[in-house]
């Protein structure tokens, strides 16, 4: 299975988890290939919208380009959504971060480690206060 199809499967899994928590959620097909800012998942509950960019890794860190985070922020401002990053490491549950909580690094790439997300990331149940 390719990395792309594996990532799509994880996104579908997250959509299912969000549905189980009462969200109306959809995966935006081809989100990374479009010329316009588009998140991987859009989830809504009680009139509140979450724009979610997903990252998965088998390693101990994920890399995010500044432009990916900037595009998530642009989409979120336009849609009136709350931007979130959803990060999943192999053998761990999904964790969520607001872009403002991302660790800064030199250059145009941010690195989020398995340890950082375990300590600072939100669990799926922590999304409830964002939309209730």
Where do the model's predicted regions map?
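Alpha-helix C-cap/termination motif
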Residues: 21, 44, 75-79
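Short, charged, amphipathic alpha-helix that recurs within catalytic cores of restriction-modification
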Residues: 49, 57-88
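Active-site metal-binding core of divalent-cation-utilizing nuclease and nuclease-like domains
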Residues: 24-46
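Conserved catalytic cores of phosphodiester-cleaving nucleases, focusing on short active-site segments
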Residues: 18, 41-58
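Domain-level recognition of nuclease-like catalytic cores that cleave nucleotide substrates
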Residues: 5-9, 77, 82-132
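Amphipathic alpha-helical interface surfaces
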Residues: 14, 37, 68-72
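Acidic-basic catalytic patches of nuclease active cores, encompassing PD-(D/E)XK
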Residues: 1-30
